[in-house]
């Protein structure tokens, strides 16, 4: 999204876009790897019942299925955090120094999503952290690297994307409800209960489309309405979850 907005205002610098993507991908892999270790040590992954597992919930299963040892997983996390940090540092030194604070915030939110002392995902703050990171931080950061400026338009539109990604995470926490409870992982689903959270999900999934409808009347391009294609599966998910939140 950030790159598309940048392309609308000039030519893309594909080399720096590649470095940006390398940094983002590396930190994502690192976050998942370190998260495997913290979730394993908390007993969270072991508590997930087989019938509750899906491709989007129940953990990555790397340790559960003995695909990797803890040492190997820690090595992957360390290597990817280092690679992502080096990619970000190269951008700061040779392209756009102001991206430093967005990068630091992104790495911190990634690591402390699972890690103590903050353990954001264990305190009902993981959903917000994901929405902020995958929305404004990544998109505004990508635009900043390309155009050398912070765009309030990009921040606004990417916030809608962040809300949807946060809602996606939220709905995938439902199958982990009992496992998260047993490991004292206080996600929003655990904190609010599944019935209340189903209504929260409905609101989160609907808000971006309401704002999306209004944006073209505020000098945004009407092509944004192409995003309403996503309203069909969103409506289906809302209807199904409200009918059977348990």
Predicted segments with their positions:
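Transmembrane helix-loop-helix
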Residues: 12, 68-112, 203-246
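Membrane-embedded alpha-helical segments that form the functional core of polytopic membrane enzymes
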Residues: 9-34, 98-111, 151-171
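C-terminal ends of transmembrane helices
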Residues: 32-36, 61, 108-121, 169, ...
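Intramembrane alpha-helical segments
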Residues: 53, 59-149
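Alpha-helical transmembrane segments of multipass membrane proteins
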Residues: 23, 27, 31, 84-87, ...
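Functional transmembrane core segments of multi-pass inner-membrane proteins
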Residues: 128-177, 181-183, 195-196
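Solvent-exposed interhelical
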Residues: 34-78, 165-206
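Long, highly hydrophobic alpha-helical transmembrane signal-anchor segments
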Residues: 1-24, 123-153
